[in-house]
């Protein structure tokens, strides 16, 4: 069935239909791209909130080829799970910087990358990978207290701000972690699908 923007929006209006745990439905990323860009066409900055927000008319960059994804894996020394590869095939980061809103502090807005794009943001991605690697032992202990076991072979690849995709070899799906530092980290999405619905569409499975 062909999906247009209206039908895709209807798909997401019903929490019963769209929130099905971690199951990745066919064409999910294509439908997600349509819905998220539709949302951003009417986006406004919420000045009372802290943190990164998407600008009006933000769009996803075109996806990567298999060769570019392989190069990305090589640059970050990771083997990407199937769902992360499918995500990158459909979209490669966002085109506009995200706005870092400072709430009611009186500080001016700042700007930074939205969803990271390869190779545009490779240097920043590598810096963030190095940052979490330096505190890996403490990070593993922090996550263990949260009930999540980070395996030794799992790589952490940032996807947006301080959100990291867990890239373990030979896996279909990947959890997403929010890591401020090695002592402040949580599981932010049980899967990439769960994370994207929460981060971009403000949907939570209740």
Positions of the model-derived regions?
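A surface-exposed partner-binding patch
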Residues: 1-151, 155-157, 161
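Substrate-binding/catalytic groove segments of enzymes
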Residues: 148-150, 165-171, 184-188
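Glycine-rich, aromatic-bearing surface loops/beta-hairpins
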Residues: 172-206
């Amino acid at each position: 069935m062909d999906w247009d923007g209206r039908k895709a929006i209807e798909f997401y209006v019903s929490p019963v239909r769209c929130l099905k745990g971690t199951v990745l439905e066919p064409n999910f990323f294509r439908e997600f791209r349509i819905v998220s860009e539709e949302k951003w066409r009417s986006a406004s900055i919420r000045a009372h909130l802290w943190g990164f927000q998407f600008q009006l008319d933000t769009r996803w960059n075109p996806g990567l080829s298999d060769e570019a994804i392989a190069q990305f894996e090589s640059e970050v020394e990771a083997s990407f799970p199937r769902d992360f590869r499918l995500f990158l095939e459909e979209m490669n980061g966002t085109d506009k910087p995200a706005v870092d809103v400072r709430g009611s502090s009186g500080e001016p807005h700042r700007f930074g990358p939205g969803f990271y794009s390869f190779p545009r943001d490779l240097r920043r991605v590598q810096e963030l990978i190095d940052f979490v690697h330096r505190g890996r032992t403490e990070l593993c202990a922090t996550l263990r207290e949260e009930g999540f076991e980070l395996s030794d072979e799992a790589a952490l690849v940032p996807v947006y701000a301080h959100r990291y995709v867990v890239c373990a070899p030979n896996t279909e799906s990947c959890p997403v972690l929010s890591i401020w530092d090695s002592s402040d980290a949580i599981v932010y999405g049980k899967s990439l699908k769960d994370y994207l619905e929460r981060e971009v569409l403000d949907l939570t499975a209740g």
